[in-house]
Every structure is written in C-alpha cells, then in structure tokens.
A protein has these predicted regions:
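Terminal accessory carbohydrate-recognition/targeting modules of carbohydrate-active enzymes
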Residues: 1, 11-248
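The feature captures the catalytic groove of carbohydrate-active enzymes
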Residues: 192-217, 275-279, 325-347, 377-407
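A broadly conserved amphipathic alpha-helix scaffold signal in soluble, globular proteins
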Residues: 147, 353, 370-373, 377-380
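Glycine-rich, histidine-containing beta strand-loop boundary motifs that form or position
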Residues: 131-133, 159-162, 203-205, 293, ...
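Substrate-binding groove/exosite segments of carbohydrate-active enzymes
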Residues: 231-367, 374
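Detector for glycine-centered tight turns/loop "hinges" at secondary-structure junctions
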Residues: 96, 124, 320-322, 332, ...
Length: 407
C-alpha cells in the first residue's frame, strides 16, 4: 500500500489495488466525491458518472451511446446519446417504506463496476446491497444486477416491482427514423428475507431501431459474457514489473483499448469513444496505434477490426496519389478530411506494416501489401527538400500552428 500511495494510486479517496487486480475505492467520511469511467460493448457504450454524496449515498448518471443508431446530420458525432439518472433502488420497498439512508462501503472497478452498500433499519435490521454495472458484450444494452442481502438480526419484507419505461425519439432527427429506448426493472417479487438470505433483480437500458425486436436479457448470462471477455484481456499479454501500479495501469489499458469496438454495417470498427468518436476509424488512432496491438493481445475481434479498417482505407487508393481521408465515419459511408493531409498515408503505412508483421499471417500480409506500397509511394512523392514528408497539418489538426512538414 505504501508503494501504491507513493505512486499516486492510494490517493486521498483511498483507492487501492485489490487482491484480484482491480481498483477499489474504500469510502470513508471524505465525501462527496465523483468520478467517471467508460465501458463498451459491440453495440453500446456507456460513460458512468458516479460518486458518493455528502450523506454517503451512491450517485449515478448513465451517459448512453448507441453508435449504430445514427442521428442527423450523420457526421462523426452522430451516435444517438441520452443520459439516464434513474435510481433503480428508489423503486424498492423494504418493510413497506422507501429504501433510504444508504451508506456506500466500497466501489470496485474490474471491467465491471461493483458497488457495495449497507442500509440500517429499525429493530436491528440491516440490509446489504451489491450493484454490478456493465455493458452487454453483444447487445445494445447496459446491464445492472442488484443483490439484496439481509445482514441484520430480524426478518425484512422486500418488494421489487417490474417496470418498463419507453422513450421514442424524434423521427425527423434519426437516419432510420424514430428510435426506441427501453428502460426496465426485472425480477418482480414480494418476500420475507430471513437473516442471511438474499434475492436478486436487474435493470437494463437498451436502444432499438423501430423495426428491431426488443430483447429479453438474462442478466446472469450477460454478466458471465462480460466477465469472460475481461478475463481474456486480463490473462493475455500480462505486464509483470516490480511496480504494481504500472502493471494495473497496463491491465486496465488493455480493457479499454480492446472493448471499444463496434459492430457497424461497415464491419467491426474500433473507436476512441469519449462521447464523441464511434462507428468510425482514423488513420492515427486505429490504423497507426491500436491495430498493431491486437495480434499481441491475441484478440480475434480486434484483429478483424484492424483488417477491416485497412480495407476501408484501401478503398481510397487512387492513381493520382491524392491524399487519403483522415477518418472514415458514419459506419464507413462517409469521410472527414477537414484538416487536409495530416500525414495520413505515413500513418497507414506504418500501422499496416506493423500489424502484418505482428500478426504473421501471409495471406493477410499479401492483402495489405498493395495498400502499404501505395502509401509508401505517396510519401515518396511528397518528400520535401529535407527528405521529410510534406503535410498540411499534424494529428492536432491545426489546434496549434502547423508547418508544411509535420512529424
């Protein structure tokens, strides 16, 4: 712990690396405190703005992103986004009353978010609550599993409702018309919990196109799929140094780098996220940076997304050697080149070469070779008198002054 605190992880809010490799915030009197984290699946991404208020209760706002529910204008930032602040536990009745006076004990990040809380009730009653929050691996939904446990000395009456809330978005603002956003509570029950007994229920936040069938999600199956995915990231390409903070940083970077892939109509597309960049690819973020990483991780979905991105850029090879677009957006049907040539061909040549070398697949390398050759020839044709490839801007896209050649 002393080593962790010296490296900045054990901060004033008592975040620590736990025995399983996750990060746990042990909540004490130093509240309120808020933070945020993004988690993604193939058809959804969610930024959780979470924290503990001055009274010790959990705060949560879900910023939901559906990358394939496209809005108008269908540009780089046209993923449907909505925020949901619904506190699911407000719907729970305990001993005929609302569930009040929550005290959060700890919050753990491990590829899911696990929140442990307690409620003190009259007559030596005490209730424990575990929230497990995570995106579906393959469905357009964010999932929440709730476990209520009687940790007191007297029986507790618990009533869990079923609930379904539907929002239909403005059809004039959607590429495919109106979208349906469905929030549900599942697991309706009324029962007595004896000391030591527990019950579970769940909530989901899903988004659909008008003609899509609503899904009935099995929360345990969804959780297992997420845990299996995270275990695959966690157990492969393990960084082992004398510094546990660096090891943990790398482990979480693997999760974020690999989970942020979306199953678009243009194929699997990795996206930076951040409530801005989805269902699109960039010559720097994807072609140059993340794609060569996936073969080392051994993540087949990542490898497929890498090959898909290079195939998209290959569409723009041309005999006149005009620049490649900086990004291919909107599920692959449009491009953005607003900063001119950022040195994008050099980025693609470098990334595609490294990907081919690290993947070690001759057939894929032969498929990529024409793109690599074209990009290198483009660079050769644009060398300046100092032997540097000329470009209009760099990756910062004129946010700062750029010259005529930008490394």
């Amino acid at each position: 712990r002393d080593a962790q605190e010296s490296r900045g992880l054990g901060d004033v809010y008592k975040r620590q690396i736990n025995s399983a490799g996750g990060i746990t915030w042990q909540v004490d009197e130093r509240v309120p405190h808020e933070d945020h984290i993004e988690m993604s699946g193939l058809r959804v991404s969610t930024v959780l703005r979470y924290g503990v208020d001055a009274n010790g209760a959990f705060m949560l706002n879900r910023s939901m992103v559906w990358p394939m529910l496209r809005t108008i204008p269908n540009n780089t930032h046209a993923s449907l986004m909505r925020r949901f602040a619904w506190n699911v536990t407000d719907m729970v009745e305990v001993n005929g009353q609302s569930l009040l006076n929550e005290k959060v004990k700890e919050v753990t990040l491990n590829g899911t978010m696990v929140v442990q809380s307690e409620y003190t009730l009259p007559r030596k009653g005490k209730l424990g609550l575990t929230r497990i929050l995570f995106p579906s691996v393959s469905n357009p939904a964010f999932c929440e599993k709730y476990i209520l446990r009687n940790i007191g000395e007297s029986a507790i009456s618990v009533e869990i409702p079923s609930s379904r809330s539907v929002v239909e978005t403005d059809a004039a603002k959607g590429v495919d018309g109106s979208y349906k956003l469905v929030s549900t509570i599942n697991g309706q029950v009324a029962r007595q919990l004896q000391p030591g007994e527990e019950l579970t229920f769940s909530a989901t936040f899903a988004g659909y196109k008008k003609d899509e069938r609503e899904l009935s999600l099995d929360i345990d199956r969804e959780l297992q799929a997420r845990q299996d995915l995270i275990a695959g990231f966690w157990d492969n390409l393990v960084l082992d140094t004398p510094d546990p903070v660096i090891n943990t940083m790398f482990a979480f970077a693997k999760i974020r780098g690999a989970e942020s892939i979306y199953d678009t109509k243009g194929g699997l597309m990795h996206g930076p996220g951040g409530e801005s960049y989805y269902a699109a690819i960039w010559a720097n973020d994807q072609a140059e940076y993340i794609n060569p990483f996936f073969p080392y991780l051994g993540y087949e979905v990542g490898n497929r997304s890498a090959l898909c991105s290079y195939e998209h850029f290959a569409r723009f090879m041309n005999p006149e050697y005009k620049p490649l677009p900086s990004s291919i957006i909107a599920e692959g049907i449009d491009v953005w080149a607003g900063a001119g040539d950022r040195g994008d061909a050099a980025m693609v040549a470098y990334g595609a070469s490294r990907y081919a070398l690290s993947k070690g697949d001759k057939a894929e390398a032969e498929k990529l070779w024409p793109l690599i050759e074209w990009c290198l020839e483009y660079c050769r044709r644009n060398l300046n008198e100092s032997g540097v490839v000329a470009s209009d801007a760099d990756e910062l896209e004129n946010r700062f002054p750029a010259g005529k050649a930008n490394l």
